[in-house]
Regions:
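HotDog/MaoC-like acyl-thioester-processing domains
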Residues: 1-14, 99-160
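Hot-dog-fold acyl-thioester-processing enzymes
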Residues: 1-92, 156-160
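Conserved interaction-surface patches within small, structured recognition/assembly domains
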Residues: 95-97
Length: 160
């Protein structure tokens, strides 16, 4: 993972894609969001969604899973090159979470993020706070998900 100083505003990353199957939608919903339009095709079809729809939390969880996997891959590649690996901290929060369009069974959502802000932390010496806008786009090119989230990122040069 990159250090704070290496992150540039405007940097865009393709994070990965996830296909929402009827089975994965129902399994997630049964555990975490058991509403009828997430659990039953007919109920979904008769709802405002027009089909079996993934929970918005499922759409966000798929994004988080891909973000973590991408970060692990970046860290592994940096370590293989003999580079120091930045271990990112937690997220202090998010804003502007939007479920823009329904994600239906069979949809594939591709996620990407863009760094929109960065600043050094006033309360945590040695850390910066990076803010990125992450979006999810379905196979038809329609944006279906968006969130603006921040993360603590270590500074390479402590005290900067």
């Amino acid at each position: 993972m990159p250090f704070f100083e290496e992150m540039e505003i405007g940097r865009r990353r393709e994070i990965g894609s996830y296909t929402f199957t009827a089975e994965s939608i129902k399994t997630f919903a049964a555990k975490f969001d058991p509403q009828r339009f997430h659990l039953d095709e007919e109920e979904g079809k008769n709802s405002l969604f027009g089909g079996l729809a993934a929970s918005g939390w499922h759409v966000g969880s798929a994004c988080m899973s891909l973000l973590v996997a991408d970060g692990q891959r970046l860290a592994r590649e940096a370590a293989e090159r003999g580079e120091e690996v930045a271990v990112w901290g937690p997220s202090p929060g998010f804003r502007d979470l939007r479920w823009i369009r329904p994600v239906l069974a069979g949809d594939t959502v591709s996620y990407a993020n863009v760094v929109i802000d960065k600043r050094t932390s006033a309360s945590r010496p040695g850390w910066g706070i990076l803010t990125a806008r992450t979006t999810g786009t379905n196979q038809r090119g329609e944006e279906v998900y968006a969130i603006t989230a921040s993360a603590f990122v270590p500074l390479r040069v402590k005290g900067a």
